[in-house]
């Protein structure tokens, strides 16, 4: 696994959202975008991370940030995640993990003595022209949203 780094151009992509509508990164040209990769909808860690972003949405809006969550889950599962947890941002389905691979976040993981391939929990902050301006790869899940807010405030 070799995640993209600061200064790299974010790869162009188009994925289905929770409403089974196509969303492209280029739709947000001219805006700052947080692309956060997470392993699986409606699991404890992913729910904590998503709810932190949900609860910070008004502040993230003031800071001019668009939030896009990407996982291998199907659009129907993403819709359930949004409904059950009242999420207020877009989730995208990457079932074949092609976008995760382009960003370098798909790779070997170990959990409970088992080794498998999956998404690593890494977030990319992309500037208005599509360049990666920050990579968040070491954080406590419960602090993810605050770390992003603190970074944006420091600019």
UniProtKB/Swiss-Prot annotation:
The Thioredoxin domain is annotated at: 4-155
Gene symbol of the encoding locus: bcp
Q: What GO molecular-function term can you cite, just one?
A: thioredoxin peroxidase activity
Q: How does it assemble?
A: Monomer.
UniProt keyword list: Antioxidant, Disulfide bond, Oxidoreductase, Peroxidase, Redox-active center
Q: Which family does it belong to?
A: Belongs to the peroxiredoxin family. BCP/PrxQ subfamily.
Please list the disulfide bridges.
46-51
Name of the protein this chain belongs to: Putative peroxiredoxin bcp
PANTHER family per record: AHPC_TSA FAMILY PROTEIN, THIOREDOXIN-DEPENDENT PEROXIDE REDUCTASE
Q: Which organism does this record belong to?
A: Haemophilus influenzae (strain ATCC 51907 / DSM 11121 / KW20 / Rd)
Q: Give the misc comment.
A: The active site is a conserved redox-active cysteine residue, the peroxidatic cysteine (C(P)), which makes the nucleophilic attack on the peroxide substrate. The peroxide oxidizes the C(P)-SH to cysteine sulfenic acid (C(P)-SOH), which then reacts with another cysteine residue, the resolving cysteine (C(R)), to form a disulfide bridge. The disulfide is subsequently reduced by an appropriate electron donor to complete the catalytic cycle. In this atypical 2-Cys peroxiredoxin, C(R) is present in the same subunit to form an intramolecular disulfide.
